[in-house]
């Protein structure tokens, strides 16, 4: 088992024990760049929220659904960019993913789904 697998397992154990079914660890906070590992217990949802100017999810394990104007199911080992719309994230299975965001881009704001 790799160190990444072990850390992901520990974070998922923490999420499964948490009342809200989730746990997160910020790995990188450098200017506008953020990288956070997030663990969600099956059935847990991150409620609809605005998308930052740029974001991606890499799923280490499990399966999640990202729902906004469109729905996308992401499986283990997949990397996807997030839409520039409001969206929610639901854990279809116990899941751990790396969320990478760029919180500011000159001339662009967070995407609220408004035209």
Say what each PLM segment does.
Residues 1-32, 67, 113-115:
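A short, N-terminal "cap"/entry segment at the start of jelly-roll beta-barrel domains
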Residues 20-21, 31-51, 84:
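Conserved short histidine dyad/triad with adjacent acidic residue
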Residues 46-48, 66-67, 86-92:
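Short beta-strand His + acidic residue motifs that chelate non-heme Fe in jelly-roll/DSBH
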Residues 84-107:
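Ligand-binding loop in jelly-roll beta-barrel domains
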Residues 45, 78-79, 96:
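Residue-level marker of beta-strand positions
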Residues 42, 52-69:
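Glycine- and acidic-residue-biased ligand/ion/polar-headgroup-sensing regions
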Residues 69-85:
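Short acidic-glycine-tyrosine-enriched beta hairpin
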Residues 60-61, 75-76, 93:
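A cytosolic small-molecule/anion-sensing beta-strand core signal
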């Amino acid at each position: 088992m790799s160190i990444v697998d072990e850390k992901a397992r520990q974070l998922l154990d923490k999420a499964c024990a948490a009342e809200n079914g989730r746990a997160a660890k910020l790995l990188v906070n450098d200017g506008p760049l953020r990288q956070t590992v997030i663990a969600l217990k099956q059935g847990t949802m991150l409620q609809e929220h605005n998308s930052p100017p740029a974001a991606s999810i890499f799923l280490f394990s499990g399966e999640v659904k990202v729902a906004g104007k469109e729905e996308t199911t992401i499986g283990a080992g997949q990397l996807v960019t997030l839409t520039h719309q409001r969206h929610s994230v639901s854990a279809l299975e116990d899941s751990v993913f790396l969320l990478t965001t760029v919180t500011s881009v000159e001339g662009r704001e967070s995407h609220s789904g408004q035209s």
